[in-house]
Amino acid sequence: MKISAVGCCLIDYLYADCDYQDTEFQSLLSTNTGDGGLIQGGLVFAEDLEVFAGKPFSELIDTLSRGKHPATNLGGPAIISLIHVSQVMHNLPVSCSFFGIIGKDHDGTLIKEYIGKTDVEAAFLELGTHPTPTTYVLGDRHALGGKGERSFINVIGAAGELTSHEIPNELFNTDLFVLGGTALLPALHEELELLLTRAKRAGAMTIVGTIFDFKNEKKNPQGRWPYKKDAYKLTDLLVCDTQEAIRLSGTTDIESAAKWFIAAGVPAFIITHGSQDILAWASSDSLFHTTELTYYPVCKHVDDMLHADPSLLMDTTGCGDNFLGGVIVSITRQLLEKSDGLLDLQDAVLWGGASGGLALLFHGGLFHESSKGQKEQLLMPIVAAYKKQLDVAHDQSEK
């Protein structure tokens, strides 16, 4: 089984002990959509924050972090989800390939070192003219009633230069083709329909995981984020969070966004909502068993662990990326088992929710294994507990 991914891959600078109630943070919060100010739970570009604040970014990040040094980790929905698959499915016949873009600098070398310790085969276009993309992650573990929240400042760097022309043809000859966080690669993001068409023509299943699209949020704060209608139809499974779903659909709430996706022709989707219920749906024409619009509870097992010992909560960074990875794990497992030909969307929610929950227990998106199979061992008890929870919820809904 072959999985290929293209999209966001960067270095995360993690500031885990921020306080969103600090005067400095509050003074830099956005007051008008797209104005360049910080967005709690969202993303802004460093260059726009500089304009908003009237100060250089180096000074701003020093103030926001109170001068503390950050932890460093690999980030990005495309690469983190793919590494999660390779770690959890290490003993199965699965190969994972990634293509991305970096600068010829220290951060680019660091990215290759991180990935080199995994089973993912990665190739990069390396530019000497632009820095490696980075994201400064401001985490407040006490936000949202102790559930934790993170806000992002992105330095786009080389990521703005990647187009479909640089992506090798062999990457499309795959069983699963994943696009993750392409909004942070603006030129490539504009070619989503072309990328999905190439993958579908090669016979691949297509999975798209979205990310906050600040470029288009700034460009048109009131309009829908662009995503061509044909691209929706070419996306076998769309995975996004509620904020992204609302802005992609131009609606105001999660259910309206879901109904808009259905009308737009998306075959199947999963919409996460932080610590709130997950919403999923699959049409009769999708690769999944027909699934009515259904709410699924988040994983209670992880909530119980954190309630019993709040010190277990590291941060929420990478939860969405690992959720996407868990979804891909589920689909890959089902394809390997070759049951009746149709996929189970609840199983995708199960593995996604368990994987996203596990990410709360370590810093950043990438889990650094000390031995092969370590992440799988940590994940499986969560999967088992969450499966029981979802089965009970399903049985109750049937009554």
Feature locations, PLM:
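Conserved phosphate-binding/catalytic loop of the ribokinase/pfkB sugar-kinase fold
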Residues: A123-L127, T135-P186
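Conserved phosphate-binding/catalytic region of the ribokinase-like
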Residues: I3-D17, T23, L28-G34, R198, ...
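Active-site nucleophile and cofactor-binding loops and adjacent substrate-binding regions
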Residues: H69-A78, G103, E126-H130, T317-G318
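Glycine-rich phosphate/adenosyl-contacting loop at the front of the ribokinase-like
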Residues: M1-S97, L312-L313, A393-K399
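Glycine/charged-rich beta-loop-alpha catalytic/anionic-binding loops adjacent to active sites
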Residues: P56-P70, G116-D119, T294-S311
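A glycine-rich helix N-cap at a beta->alpha junction
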Residues: Y114-P131
